[in-house]
Amino acid sequence: MRRQRPSVATARDAPSLEVYNIIPIHDFLTEHPSLRYPEVRAAAAALRIVGDLPKPPFADFTPRMDLMDWLGLLFGFQIDNVRNQRENLVLHLANSQMRLQPPPRHPDGLDPTVLRRFRKKLLRNYTNWCSFLGVRCHVTSPIQSRHQTNAVLNLRRELLYVALYLLIWGESANLRFMPECLCYIFHHMAMELNKVLAGEFDDMTGMPYWPSFSGDCAFLKSVVMPIYKTVKTEVESSNNGTKPHSAWRNYDDINEYFWSKRALKSLKWPLDYTSNFFDTTPKSSRVGKTGFVEQRSFWNVYRSFDRLWILLLLYLQAAIIVATSDVKFPWQDRDVEVALLTVFISWAGLRLLQSVLDASTQYSLVSRETYWLFIRLTLKFVVAVAWTVLFSVFYARIWSQKNKDGVWSRAANERVVTFLKVVFVYVIPELLALVLFIVPCIRNWVEELNLGVVYFLTWWFYSKTFVGRGMREGLVDNVKYTLFWIIVLATKFIFSYFLQIRPLIAPTRALLNLKDATYNWHEFFGSTHRIAVGMLWLPVILVYLMDLQIWYSIYSSLVGATIGLFSHLGEIRNIDQLRLRFQFFSSAMQFNLKPEEHLLSPKATMLKKARDAIHRLKLRYGIGQPFNKIESSQVEATWFALIWNEIILTFREEDLISDREVELLELPPNCWNIRVIRWPCFLLCNELLLALSQANELCDAPDHWLWSKICSSEYRRCAVMEAFDSIKFVILKIVKNGTEEESILNRLFMEIDENVENEKITEVYKLTVLLRIHEKLISLLERLMDPEKKVFRIVNILQALYELCAWEFPKTRRSTPQLRQLGLAPISLEADTELLFVNAINLPPLDDVVFYRQIRRVHTILTSRDPMHNVPKNIEARERLAFFSNSLFMTMPQAPSVEKMMAFSVLTPYYDEEVMYRQEMLRAENEDGISTLFYLQRIYEDEWVNFLERMRREGAENENDIWSKKVRDLRLWASYRGQTLSRTVRGMMYYYSALKKLAFLDSASEMDIRMGTQIAPEARRSYYTNDGGDNTLQPTPSQEISRMASGITHLLKGSEYGSAMMKFTYVVACQVYGQHKARGDHRAEEILFLMKNHDALRIAYVDEVDLGRGEVEYYSVLVKFDQQLQREVEIYRIRLPGPLKLGEGKPENQNHALIFTRGDAIQTIDMNQDNHFEEALKMRNLLESFKTYYGIRKPTILGVREKVFTGSVSSLAWFMSAQETSFVTLGQRVLANPLKVRMHYGHPDVFDRFWFVPRGGISKASRVINISEDIFAGFNCTLRGGNVTHHEYIQVGKGRDVGLNQISMFEAKVASGNGEQALSRDVYRLGHRLDFFRMLSFFYTTVGYYFNTMLIVFTVYAFLWGRLYLALSGVEKIAKDRSSSNEALGAILNQQFIIQLGLFTALPMILENSLERGFLPAVWDFITMQLQLASFFYTFSMGTRTHYFGRTILHGGAKYRATGRGFVVEHKKFAENYRLYARTHFIKAIELAIILLVYAAYSPLAKSSFVYILMTISSWFLITSWIISPFLFNPSGFDWLKTVNDFDDFIAWLWSRGGLFTKADQSWFTWWNEEQEHLKTTGVWGKLLEIILDLRFFFFQYSIVYHLRIAENRTSIGVYLISWGCIIGIVAIYITTIYAQKRYSVKEHIKYRFIQFLVILLTVLVVVMMLQFTKLTVVDLLISLLAFVPTGWGLISIAQVLKPFLLSTVVWDTVISVARFYDLFFGLIVMAPVALLSWLPGFQNMQTRILFNEAFSRGLQISIILAGKKST
């Protein structure tokens, strides 16, 4: 939906009310906290140094304008682009100057060092580009001069260059994906700027020189639009990405055009629109693909990683040669040694293959301008042929001489030496590469030299590319990952030789030596048994090529666990371990989160590092002074309490803990003259009772002995002292001042204090009386907490306490006169007849929040008997506290102050997902009667109770009020438990909240912090009191709640907001927000609500303005909510050259919003992610990592750990969560260190913003090829010399798909993306430019993982087809009689599959869980997962990955698949599961099942049940999991009634005719056509290979017909041809029946029935005659079905490939009809086990238990959910 163009008056507010984004740069007189910083004023003032710059012609340049305005008028930039980049530049310069160490001498002026560093960083890519092309850089160096004027001019010139680049970047729209294109634009515009600054004259006019374009939107119209239209034309010609990649130019092709000087010659400046680069020229003469051509072929996996395959194939050849020899060691036999030389012939042959692949895929790059490429491709082919021939000739000469001499004569040995000399010449380049590998710094230096000599020397090996140079790591990292891979490769090769290759030698020889074997069919290739040998070796070779992935998985898991162990992960695994280290926790928090006082000199760095390391060691192991020695009055204790309490309050706001748990967890401030630190109650529980017990046992022991026993536990000491001080204060508080009772009490406490000081407690008092005093004190506190406050009871208790303390407590009983003399009894005579305290009680009012809160705390300390192991009760709260506390003992950079930290932004792309759950959504029920809210109430039961408690405190009287008064809170509560935008926004805004509070603590004085603890209690909430033992919590009249409770928020003075805003911005790229607003979508209102509640939130969207006449203008708009105006306001509106989406939608959405981000870093956050307040506190530490060298480079991407928060919903979600967790933790840990190949995988990584801005941004967007857009940011980073690290002391929450269908769609999306990656230029360049061992790491963690997963499935296919061939051909029977090795072979192959299944998925999870949760819990979790059939899920997922990865490489068809992020508890219908899994799993499983059944019928080995089971158990497991998993993990999947309904629904769907607009879920025909979409876009080779693969189905018929009795053991080819006659007859009968049905079934039904009768009669007659007059049996008929059914499916599959030729013929109707019957047949096969299990009693309950076992273990009533019974 588009809106009309806004008028000028409404487009923007009046100038006096100009809207600003973060800081009001336009008006420095505004009262804004950011403007108090001199650095901000200095940066803005520097921009106003216009001086004597010439005024742009035809423009109104006013004195108020600055350099940005001048550039905007000079080059025609948009006004809002200028405003946007002005703030961007000022903020960055100001933040950079704040961090400057030592601080500048003149803080009111911009330090030139800051600007110079920024200019070098921002323009480094441009300067490298100029050096690469050999052109002069137009950024002139500043003049070194101390003269003030020159310094100002230099500063201005630097500012102009930086500002010019930012303005170009800010308005380039989609061109930002092409960084070298921007370099080209900047290069020429900087040249024009230099001419203007130099005052040069135009050669044509003789007038002062001005840029070639100017005016309103001149840059957009003259530069951006022509290039944009070219990109747009290319994308449109791709037919929505379905055409081959080689047929059109994508972003990378157009960008790489600027990697050569021909761009400078062709495009010129101003741009020559007639150039063949632009879309103005015909496609035939236009510039084609540049740099690389993406061809769709499996050969890409070999071509990109040829070094790996050469290694594997050459070792395989060498191992076979050695294994076939009869010597123990190869050096014992010269024949074997010489035979090993054939590996060099193979090596040369593989190089020849590589050259052929290069030429066949990249030929379209050749043109008149790139003739050197043609020469290189040709020469490489010729040289490869020459080496192959040369090696072959020299090798043949060796054997000819040896055969001639009969022995290894001297002449023969000389020819061996000659051969080795040739080998030496051949491997010289490899030796040179080895030398450079050992000294990587030299290789980096050579590669980065832009010299013609270097290009000439490397021309043969590499194409000249701007990226992929200088990628070697440092020597230390080099050694680490080299050792890792040497160990892995050594293990793999030893295992392969002894357990794979050698065991096959004997069976191979036995087969080749079979001379008298006869085949059971017509054998086309004689009786050499080579096909049988090939079938024997094929699965072994596939396992050999694949199992390096297994060994990598094993060793990477071990290394990852070891690194995690040394990183101190998992040392605090639970709350109990946190209790033990809580005393050191505060010191650790202060050490890491509290900034140090920076010295003026940055020296002594190594000394500081050593001191920090020692301090961290002391903290970690409790050495030195812990926190228990710090008194409660010290600022450090208060600082820690403020942060800790803020974390606890955040938990309460998230409803993770209850009000009562807040009281138990919080660290209250000092009050009531308590002399010790007031530890959280959950630490002090039971400690006082233990102290009383010790006092009772040691009542006669000396004081120091008793006190030392109590002090053995710091918590016990504090509990005793706090209890005494609190009781003392409480009793004196409730007694009136000036009364005699007060005097007595003061004297009594004074006496006790004196005895304590003199260590006479045990000497003077009877400690056994303490227990009675304890009971009375508890009664007193309970009466005080009673809302009714019955004073007479309190008087009685006080009187009893007085008598105990005055009369019974002392060992020496004192008389009344003695007590009066000591001041411990009333002096007046009346007091003898009156009770004490009757008229002396003055209870505090009920609104005294502090008093009653402390009363409850003291009561808890006095009464708690259990150790409170379940505080907090919520699992997520416990895990978060444990991780946060553990992370503070890990190594991390120390945090700077907020003012000196690096600024950063968070960017989240959003399209149209849920923002908040609406009221109707929460109430809507599914077919089982389950609403979303009901589901959440059961899953998050404790959190729902906490929410209700909070709502009651905030005014809700009952649950009905929640649906009226508190419906917004209800919606938010539900939304925060789903994968919604509101959850993500809340999590990211914790950064803002944390920075505000940290900024206050950084700048607060000691008095401010002390005030925080004094003011806080008065603003605290009062929680609930316990009424007389009843567990029902009753609110007290004095209840209130406030964020002031932590003692921070209420102290914020305003400047903290400015600091936080300058350091953090959150931009959500809501691409269609404008459309949502225009049509009144509820999501627009909800997004506005989020902006209103979060100051730092900004929304970027694309606005489409209809100009009429079919013209539309597109604008990138940034909006915020103005708290003063109380409405949404528009900040920037920047016109785009056209529609936003040319490539993939998500990166385009990110790209348009990227210009609105701020800061040095940018964190990419997806819509399904979350964050926590306690983690946000550590962001300053993380950003400091950008300043540290990791290896030889500083990081450009900081990897952040993820915590999957959707693992507790169901067992299926747990499986996915466990798999994902091991990948995002252990996997990423190893990739970063030691392997140094971590990329960006869509994680919440933090990018160095100004490193990526000039290098193409944070993702790639080319259509289809970049469908996995995020990982290409990592590829691009590595290729351009970046460094990616991984940090596990901070984590971000992440949601994962929780239903099988959702998970499958996600797996399909990722697998398809990897299929496209395999074709991409980035993967090819990384495969060639990384050193050998990093290349191995890269392969096995990206494309190789999916390729090897596919090889696993291929191995199963090859093994089963091979066994079938051996069985049906008769070779197996003959071999069985002479050898039993084949049985061992089957066991070996099955062990391989089981090893893969276990180690691929289990080992990383077990080790990571062992590290973070402990070994026994990890083993128990693994056993539990197996009992819940996790292996079924992982095997099923393997099939999904295999299907989509293979199909994408072969045919394409990758697309974005919306997985959905809802809650999955509803039952999925059979038809839906069939549509999703029929082609990916069901048909493949049925095929394998038929193979096993045929094999069981005809194999002599299968007659032994044990051998058959041993050989096929893993295959049957795979078949079972592929068929049954969609129903096993489907709620109510085995409910009989649902199964019956599903079958009816499936039949109705199958026979639905459909129509033009019918969807796939409504009609089988529509779905069937959609399943063939990939065949429409595939190439000729894809179709040909598909047909070749489909030919396998004909093998069933070929092999089985010869085993029928009617064949009479004949092996003539005629038997097979006759069987085709039967198929033709069956098809003819079917066609006749279908034709009769269409022609006569409606109007002439009798004719139709007559024809049916004739057909049936004729068929029965033919069958009876054959049974009577031939040897055909009924069994033959049944077996023929096994033969003809696969043949029919093969014919249909081939017909689908040939659809363009058959569509217009009558054959196609028959194909459709037969295909429908086949899907009915397959559906019935799949439905059969489901129906059987549904019919069996009790199986549904078992399935529910399996699926939701995790929920059961947490006490959730999933059975109630599934039954839809809402219990009240």
Curated annotation (Swiss-Prot):
It is an enzyme of class 2 (transferase). Ubiquitous. It holds the Pfam family Glucan_synthase. Keywords: Cell membrane, Cell shape, Cell wall biogenesis/degradation, Glycosyltransferase, Membrane, Transferase, Transmembrane, Transmembrane helix. It is a multi-pass membrane protein. InterPro entries: FKS1-like_dom1, Glyco_trans_48_dom. Its EC number is 2.4.1.34. It catalyses: [(1->3)-beta-D-glucosyl](n) + UDP-alpha-D-glucose = [(1->3)-beta-D-glucosyl](n+1) + UDP + H(+). PANTHER family: CALLOSE SYNTHASE 11 (PTHR12741:SF102), LYST-INTERACTING PROTEIN LIP5 DOPAMINE RESPONSIVE PROTEIN DRG-1 (PTHR12741). Belongs to the glycosyltransferase 48 family. This is Callose synthase 11. It comes from Arabidopsis thaliana. The lineage of its organism: Eukaryota, Viridiplantae, Streptophyta, Embryophyta, Tracheophyta.
